[in-house]
Amino acid sequence: MSAKQPNRKPAGKRKESDASAQEGRERKRAAKRKGLKAGSRQQVEQAGKKSGTKQAKDPRIGSRKPVALIVEEKSSKPVAPKQIKEKKLVMTPEQELASIENDDRLNDLLDRLDAGETLEATEQAWVDQRVDRYQELMDELGIIDTDDDEDEADFDEADFDEPGQPASEEELWDRFTQVDYQPEPKPEPKKK
């Protein structure tokens, strides 16, 4: 049969000390009562009145800084408005050329020059600058200025076919074979 097990203490209630019993009772009372005591709002105000040395706390929330109802003008330095940097508009050469051609001031000054008037130094410098820029743009865009009379004298309409009549294939072939085509010589690569 089985061996006899050692005697165990009976599994009864454990004895409590007086202190732990008292703590248990307090916890039980606190658990029964939930929330604040009745009339706690009024009791808080009364507690504030009892301490007469302290100033009564204002229950309102917010700033206690006084607000000026009348606007007073300050006699300080006027603030200079910030200078906004104007971005230069980047224009294409075609747009810039068109703006120079349509410039009323430039056209008026050029008309005065053509009439034989003399311009002030600043106006003359400005006109020269704009005309130079106009020439630069014309060269950059590859536009030939048709206002020159010398170029028109060299132009002979008889040398060109009328645009309405296409050349025959034989004429085109003759023109092609008569052209002396000599390709440009290629530079020799440098030897190291």
From Swiss-Prot:
GO molecular function ontology, one term from the record: GTPase activator activity
Biased segments, Basic and acidic residues type: 13-26, 183-192
Q: Which GO terms describe its biological process?
A: ribosome biogenesis
- Where in the sequence is the signal peptide annotated? none
Say yes or no: keyword Transmembrane present.
Answer: no
Residue ranges spanning the membrane: these are none
The family assignment reads: Belongs to the YihI family.
This chain's function reads:
A GTPase-activating protein (GAP) that modifies Der/EngA GTPase function. May play a role in ribosome biogenesis.
Protein name, please? Answer: Der GTPase-activating protein YihI
Q: Which organism is it from?
A: Aeromonas hydrophila subsp. hydrophila (strain ATCC 7966 / DSM 30187 / BCRC 13018 / CCUG 14551 / JCM 1027 / KCTC 2358 / NCIMB 9240 / NCTC 8049)
